[in-house]
Swiss-Prot record:
GO terms for biological process: ubiquinone biosynthetic process. Its main location: mitochondrion. Lyase that catalyzes the C1-decarboxylation of 4-hydroxy-3-methoxy-5-(all-trans-polyprenyl)benzoic acid into 2-methoxy-6-(all-trans-polyprenyl)phenol during ubiquinone biosynthesis. Component of a multi-subunit COQ enzyme complex. Zn(2+) binds at H134, D135, H138, E150. This is Ubiquinone biosynthesis protein COQ4 homolog, mitochondrial. PANTHER family: UBIQUINONE BIOSYNTHESIS PROTEIN (PTHR12922), UBIQUINONE BIOSYNTHESIS PROTEIN COQ4 HOMOLOG, MITOCHONDRIAL (PTHR12922:SF7). It comes from Plasmodium chabaudi chabaudi. Disulfide bonds: none annotated. Belongs to the COQ4 family. InterPro entries: Coq4, Coq4_euk. Its EC number is 4.1.1.130.
Length: 355
């Protein structure tokens, strides 16, 4: 409580309604131009979220766990949490996974801005806590920090908080999400010549030589295929082929899919050749990398948003009203089971999961 009281006093900005409106309009225009400037999003949320935060407060003060949180006002900051100790926890604990996420993406809970425009310390705390718990949301739902993953998490947060800024993010995100994305996945470290002109960015198929970095030369509809890596089980191959052929009419189940985790020396591909109207089994030279191609905007609209809506509705309690600090040394799967948290489906992990 003492820690947040100091934070509240040092961050509170006294503005009238006209001043808040001016800041809100300026921040909204700035968010679209520079979405990575998270403080703009924070200011817009401060000003637009009074009624939503009021409802969250009413919920928490009538909830046993919520009342304790409001009374003690715990924070995910170094004064309250021994972050170095979290690294020493077992690997499947929430605290270890949380630190793993923060370090992978070079983040810290201190980066989350405190609320500025609430006169009430409880309201200010609720919004500040929501921002700090946001990274916990990434961890328990297994979402990375791409635009589409952030938007999916905002869908869950909208259901749990009703904050207007989350709705704005959901509506704007599809226009900011790339139509197409290339992603190189390396078995080992990135080779030193990766950015040099001599690096082999291409593969040779039976029909033409395709520059995989050139959208103009790359005809996506001619290359619906699996990249199959590390597979040595023939039965697995048979099941994989059956899945591929059974789902050809639903390209969402095929495009951009990678199966991995087994041992395969041939690095085989299956493609469908539109010109000859046949399926082709290719044996390519083994490489130390493979190229992952997918459509982030299509994935967001057709898969991530529906999953996020379902996950948000399924959770028995919003994260901000859970005493997360008491769960850091507990098993993350137990946490998910306790609150019916549904993590990202496996088939979306490489695109949107924490890797």
């Amino acid at each position: 409580m003492n820690n947040f009281a100091k934070i509240f006093q040092s961050n509170w900005i006294d503005l009238n309604k006209l001043g808040k409106l001016e800041i809100f309009l300026k921040t909204i225009s700035g968010i679209y131009k520079a979405p990575n400037r998270t403080h703009l999003l924070a200011h817009a949320a401060d000003i637009s979220s009074f009624y939503a935060v009021k409802n969250i407060y009413e919920y928490m003060k009538n909830d046993d766990e919520g009342k304790v949180i409001l009374k003690n006002k715990p924070l995910l900051i170094r004064q309250d949490i021994q972050f170095n100790e979290l690294k020493k926890l077992p690997k499947n604990t929430l605290g270890y996974k949380y630190m793993e996420f923060l370090e992978a993406y070079k983040l810290h809970a201190h980066d989350r801005e405190a609320a500025h425009f609430f006169d009430d310390i409880n309201y200010s705390y609720i919004l500040t806590r929501y921002r700090q718990i946001h990274d916990i949301g990434h961890v328990v739902y297994n979402l990375n920090i791409s635009i589409e993953s952030e938007a999916a998490l905002k869908m869950i947060e909208l259901i749990h908080t009703k904050l207007p800024i989350t709705l704005l993010a959901i509506l704007v995100a599809p226009f900011m999400t790339p139509l197409y994305r290339f992603q190189y996945i390396f078995k080992d470290k990135i080779p030193p010549n990766f950015l040099n002109p001599n690096f082999d960015y291409t593969y040779k198929d039976d029909y033409n030589y395709i520059d995989e970095l050139s959208l103009k030369q790359y005809v996506y509809n001619l290359t619906e295929y699996f990249h199959i890596d590390k597979i040595d089980n023939n039965i697995f191959f048979q099941k994989l082929y059956k899945y591929y052929f059974d789902n050809l009419n639903n390209s969402n189940n095929i495009r951009g899919t990678i199966i991995y985790g087994y041992n395969n020396e041939d690095n085989n591909d299956i493609i469908f050749d539109d010109i000859n109207n046949e399926y082709i089994f290719l044996k390519n030279p083994e490489k130390n990398y493979f190229l992952f191609k997918y459509k982030p905007r299509q994935t967001l609209l057709k898969q991530l948003y529906p999953w996020a809506y379902m996950a948000g509705m399924a959770a028995t309690k919003p994260l901000h009203s859970i005493h997360i600090e008491n769960w850091l040394d507990k098993d993350i799967d137990l946490f998910r089971k306790t609150y019916n948290i549904i993590p990202l489906p496996d088939h979306l992990n490489l695109m949107s999961g924490i890797n």
